[in-house]
């Protein structure tokens, strides 16, 4: 017969194993983590001494979602108003804010050469202004050259399959039956 020994655990000298039921677990933890108990004092005084050692700081209020929503309503956007219109780094042009790398930026306009296409769109002619006034919109010129044929538009609901007429013939056979 072999006698098995319980497994030995390496423990520190300050480690104490305690078995407690849930009803008095809190009291035992407070006793063990508080000041060393006096032999003459009762368990109630040890618990109250542990409570007295805790710092009396105000408890932080719990985070509430509705408070975050209310604080987001109070946010404000502050736009820098530049008073000098001749400022080369001003990002304001004709009363609206443009991108710092936009061709509408006055600084960018002096540094970057304009292409013919940009100049064409910058100043619409009288015909274009008339078309805009009549129709309410205008079309930009096509980037394609005029020598190329117009692209073929495909029907939205084709009656025949693009790979042949087999599909159409198959439908006709079903109608005859």
From Swiss-Prot:
One of its GO terms (cellular component) is nucleus. The keyword Phosphoprotein applies. The keyword Cytoplasm does not apply. Its main location: nucleus. It holds the Pfam family VQ. The modification Phosphoserine is found at residues 43, 99, 115, 142, 145, 161. Phosphorylated on serine residues by MPK6. A motif (VQ) lies at residues 25-34. Residues 148-159 have a biased composition (Low complexity). Keywords: Nucleus, Phosphoprotein. Residues 115-177 are annotated as: Disordered. Residues 115-133, 168-177 have a biased composition (Basic and acidic residues). It is found in: Nucleus. May modulate WRKY transcription factor activities. This is VQ motif-containing protein 11.
